[in-house]
Amino acid sequence: MTVFDSIVSRTPVDKGWSGDRKYKAFCADGSCYFLRISPMSKFEKLKRQFSHMQQVQALGIRLCAPVEFGVCGEGVYTLLQWVDGRDAEGVLPTLDKKAQYAYGLEAGRMLRTIHSLPSPVPTEPWSLRYDRKLDAKIAAYRACPI
């Protein structure tokens, strides 16, 4: 039985800009996970992403640990370890400059370690991928009602 199959309830997570459906998923044994359900068209991309997360975890980087990846009736799913806490977006401004700087240094060290992994072979030029990502973010920003 997969972890996905042992989920007994879900609570929607309404954060982020992706169109994926996100949930805090609960299992009968009391464990909980971050569940992301995406369209099947994203299968290959998300499979690579899950593999990269496993590689990053193997480096000792703290992240929501990748637990399971698969296909369900709703699309392709990714299950990550749930980490309780608060969003840095709300917490960082309440910290003094020294603490903010310390977190920035730690994040930089983590990124340096992540960048030690070999880069995947791109299927298209970086500039095209980046422009497409920016265009999507700009469109989402413009559509945001705030």
Predicted regions and their residues:
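ATP-binding pocket architecture of kinase catalytic cores
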Residues: 12-128
